[in-house]
Amino acid sequence: MTYNEDKKQGDDGEHTGRYQRSTTRWRNDEMTYMNAEIKAELLALGKVDVEPSLLTRPSRSTAGPGAGLRSIFFKSGGHRVRLEITPDSPLKMVEQNGAVVILKDNQELVRGVIDPVVAHCPEQTYITISEQCMYDCKFCSVPKFQGKIKTLDQVLEIVEKVKKSGNLKTIAFTSGVATTPENEIDRVVAYVQAVKKYNVPVGVAVYPTQDSSQRLKDAGVTEVKYNVETMDREIFERVCTGRKGHSLDFILTSLHDAVRVFGKNQVSSNIIIGLGETDECVRKGVEYLAKMGVIAVLRPITISPYRKGEITATRPSAERLLKLTKMTRDILKKYDLHVEDSQTMCLPCTGCDLTPGRDV
C-alpha cells in the first residue's frame, strides 16, 4: 500500500479513514508515520546516518549554528524535520520497498518521504546573502568559515532557477554581518527591491539597526525576524561575544519597533534551547515577546564541531521540547498570535523546530 499524505491526511492534521491517531504514533497496520512525539524524538537526536542510495542531493547550510553541515529534510504524516547527515547517529535512514524509513536500534521509528529542497529548505527560496560575520557568537559556525557574499546577479540567478522549476512561492533572505549591520541592511534592501518583480512574499532575518524595520518594510518585505538568541542575560553576554553596543536590550527594542511597522504575526525571533537556560526563563521570554506581538521560535541548539571547546551546550530532550512547545502554543493563543499565518522563513518550514500551531 502506498501512503499518500495529501489524500490520507485532513487539513487539521488528523488522519482519516483507516488512519487513526494513537497516543504516540500514527499507525496503519505496522507502518508508523510522524506525529509531534516522534518529531520531538528526531529533533532531540538531530542526526541521521543516511543510506548512500538516498543521498541524491543533500543540503548544506550556510547560516547559523548548522553552517557547513550537510542535512536532509524528511516528511511524514504532515510533519517535516531536518536532520544533520552523519554516520555517528543511532538513527539510520534507509529505503524499504519503495518507502523511506528511519530506523532506531534496527527497529522502524517512522516512515515517509525525502522532502526536496528548493533553495536551502523545501517550498521556499531561502538565500543566505553574507556567509561572513564580524561577530563571534559561540553557538554559530559562520565566523569560522568567512565565506562568500552573494552578488545581486547570483541571487537573481537562484530565484530565476526556482521560478523556472515552477516552485517559486516565497523568498527569504538571511545574512551574517560582514562589516557592519548598517552595510548589511543596505545590501538586503537593494536585493529585496530587486526581487519585488516576482510578486511573492519576502521574509528577512537579519541583525537590526535603528531604522531597519522601516527600511525593510518600504523595500517590500512581508515579514521580519530579529533573533534574541536567548532571554537569559548572563548567557547572552557569555555566548554573544563581539557585539559591542548591540545588546539584548537593543534587539528587544528593535523587535518592538518591528511590530509597530509590520504588525502582529509578522515578526518572529529565535530563542535557542540548550545553552543552559531554565524552562522558566524560556517561559518568561516567550511571554515577554508575545506581549509585544512577536512569535518566539524555539530552536534546539546545533552543537557544531567547528565550535568544539568554545561552548557548553546540551541538545534538549524530546520531553523538554514537547513541554516548551506546548507552553509556547498556549502563550501565543493567549496573545492572539497565529503561527499558521506566517508565510516565510522558519515558521512555515518547521524543519528545524517543533512548531506550535503546526506540529503541536
Describe the predicted segments one by one.
Residues A119-L152:
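Canonical Radical SAM [4Fe-4S] cluster-binding loop centered on the CxxxCxxC motif
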Residues E234-G242, I273-E277, V297-E319, E340-G357:
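Flexible glycine/acidic-rich beta-alpha junction loops that bind and position SAM and/or redox cofactors
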Residues S59, Q266, R320-V360:
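A C-terminal junction/extension of Radical SAM enzymes
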Residues S141-E157, K163-A190, A194-S254, S268, ...:
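Core AdoMet radical
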